[in-house]
Structures are given as structure tokens and as C-alpha cells.
């Protein structure tokens, strides 16, 4: 019996030694480099970042749905789907579809509130590849497409000081971008292009004039740059400068101090 214990102990020692040697060999084969910030000069051949003359992104956002979560991450996303995020439409007055401003011309509720919810809901649908949620998302997205006007404007007409406010549209543009990443639906590009062409017709002193839309003007610029990068049309750069000049006229300290 004593000899058996000796052999077992020896076998465990040899196994442990081999494991340590393997780990040491694996760690010595690789190197770790610490940098202040990522290299922005290398070209990513898989995903597009910002096009010049925009400053390259430190990290390129992956298209929504390109990563399929597993394990505890997926479990938490499923809890969101089965909880308030996935069922908010059943209890929220803002998501009531009858007379909703995103589904009905002249609707009386659901301006910025709808895209606030839809941005997270739709991304969750794409990531989980949930057919029911994707169908619900598509219902709202089709409502957005149906709201397009001949001059390029889309969505609810919420007038302040005699002009159309752009706050709710800024948020819905994010929803459309996520939808495009998932579906490659060309209607998104057409809608956004025509919408920003309409913005170019708005006099500078009337663009982003209201406090809230001016506060969110940077959100508008992000959507412009998202559209500019794959196509490189000078028009997008011009509208970006136009929006930036109007948005940056209000000190961020005044907004958030």
C-alpha cells in the first residue's frame, strides 16, 4: 500500500511539473505590449472606420448582431428580453400604437420616447436573433419609412418657435443605423441622405436653435459622419460642418455644469 501511495504521489508530481512547464512555455512564446493609446494608422480590412479627413477611430464599432453571446452574458440579455425591455410596449403609454406620432401623421404621443426604447430593443432583437422581437422592430421601422416627406424630412412634426424640431429624429437615426447594419436595407441610406439634404436648406440661425435639440446636436453629427465614411460625398462633410458650427456655439459647461 505504501508503494502505491508513493507511485500516485510521483505521478501527480510529474503531471504538475508538465503543466507548469507547458504554461511557462506558452507565456514565454507571447509578448504583451503596453501603449498609451491604440494605433490608428493601420487599416482594418474587415470593418470601416472614419474616412479622411475625419480623425481615425481608436476602436471600430462592430456591426450589431455580428457577435453572438453565450453563457452568462446571453442569460442576462434573455432576462432583459423577458423583463421590462422586452415587454415595455405592453404597459407604456408612449409606445401605444394608436395615434402614435411615429406611426400616424399628427399623432399625439411618442416623440423621442419611441426611439429611446427602440434603440435598445432592436439591438437586443438582432443580438439574440429573436424572430418575435425582430418582427416588432420591423413594424416600427416601416412606420419610420412611411413617414418620409417629399422634402426629405421624416418622422413626427413637432414645431417649436415656428420650425420643425429635430431632437426625436436624432435618436431615431441611431435606430436606423442599427437596422442597416443588421439588414443592409438601402432605404436607410436613401432616407438619411435626403434628410440631411433637407437640413442643408434650413438657415443656419434656425438649425439646432431650440435648447434641447442644440444640446443633442452632437448626436446629429455622429449620424452624419456614419453616413459620410462609406460614401465620401463632400455634401456630408458640408452638413457636418454646418451642424457643428451651430451645435458648438453653446458651451457644454452651460448645459451640464
Regions found by a protein language model. Give the residues of each.
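Bacterial N-terminal signal peptides that target proteins for export
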Residues: 1-11
Amino acid at each position: 500500500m505504501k508503494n502505491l501511495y508513493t507511485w500516485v504521489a510521483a505521478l501527480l508530481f510529474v503531471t504538475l511539473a508538465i503543466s507548469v512547464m507547458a504554461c511557462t512555455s506558452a507565456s514565454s512564446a507571447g509578448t504583451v505590449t503596453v501603449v498609451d493609446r491604440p494605433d490608428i494608422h493601420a487599416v482594418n480590412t474587415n470593418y470601416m472606420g472614419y474616412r479622411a479627413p475625419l480623425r481615425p477611430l481608436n476602436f471600430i464599432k462592430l456591426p450589431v448582431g455580428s457577435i453572438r453571446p453565450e453563457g452568462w452574458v446571453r442569460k442576462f440579455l434573455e432576462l432583459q428580453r423577458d423583463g421590462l425591455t422586452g415587454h415595455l410596449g405592453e404597459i407604456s403609454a408612449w409606445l401605444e400604437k394608436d395615434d402614435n406620432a411615429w406611426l400616424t401623421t399628427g399623432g399625439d404621443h411618442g416623440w423621442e420616447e419611441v426611439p429611446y426604447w427602440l434603440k435598445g430593443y432592436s439591438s437586443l432583437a438582432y443580438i439574440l436573433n429573436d424572430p418575435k422581437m425582430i418582427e416588432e422592430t420591423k413594424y416600427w421601422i416601416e412606420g419610420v419609412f412611411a413617414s418620409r416627406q417629399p422634402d426629405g424630412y421624416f418622422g413626427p412634426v413637432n414645431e417649436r418657435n415656428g420650425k420643425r424640431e429635430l431632437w426625436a429624429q436624432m435618436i431615431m437615426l441611431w435606430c436606423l443605423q442599427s437596422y442597416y447594419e443588421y439588414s443592409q436595407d438601402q432605404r436607410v441610406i436613401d432616407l438619411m441622405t435626403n434628410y440631411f439634404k433637407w437640413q442643408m436648406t434650413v438657415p443656419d440661425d434656425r438649425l439646432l436653435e431650440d435648447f434641447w435639440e442644440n444640446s443633442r446636436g452632437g448626436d446629429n453629427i455622429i449620424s452624419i459622419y456614419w453616413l459620410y465614411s462609406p460614401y465620401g460625398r463632400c455634401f456630408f462633410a458640408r452638413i457636418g460642418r454646418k451642424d457643428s458650427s451651430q451645435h458648438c456655439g453653446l458651451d457644454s459647461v452651460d448645459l451640464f455644469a
